[in-house]
Amino acid sequence: AEQTLRTKSVVVAAGAWLPRLVGQHVSLRPLHAVRAQPSHFAPRPGFDDIEMWPTFIHRGLSAQPEVENSWYGLWTPGEGVKVGSHLVHDELDLDNRSFEINRKFESALQEYVAQWYPGLDADKVTSTTCIYTNEPNEHFILDRKGPLTVCSPCSGHGFKYVPAIGKITADLAMGGTQSVKEWQF
């Protein structure tokens, strides 16, 4: 149903679609959206304390030399340990997004897991795709212009800071100002 809602302010947190939605109202830094492909790996039998799995960021080489990388991982209840890449992604066309799994990259993740994480079964993998958005300096865009608050924590990078980002965004929406220059428009 169509409805008109009038408010004193609005928050737009639209990820890769942010330039299309607010680009005519504010001057944004460029955003680059790519197709990321994290995978979930099952624990090996006998690895009973999987819920205690630490979140990690690992800068290093995979078993495939052309894939120098920064890897991340975290326990996801019901799915296993999520492992992904911060640096290696496929280019993305937002209007024609593919959900097809890149088997070469999945293989690189499997080899990495087999090399570094003996508690995980590299053969028991479930991969998915998602959109990963960044700006050139990997900073956030959290700012306000008039009644418009823009929140772009830039995908996985911002996920680590959700409580702080939420607090800052709420403050901006209520009339606060942004003092961190790197996060301004």
What are these regions (language model features)?
Residues 1:
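A conserved short coil-to-beta-strand element within the FAD-binding core of flavoproteins
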Residues 114-185:
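C-terminal catalytic lobe of FAD-dependent flavoproteins
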Residues 15-16, 163:
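Alpha-helix N-cap/helix-start capping motif
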Residues 4, 9, 16-146:
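Active-site substrate-recognition segment that forms the wall
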Residues 14-15, 152:
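Glycine-rich, N-terminal phosphate-binding loop of Rossmann-like dinucleotide-binding domains
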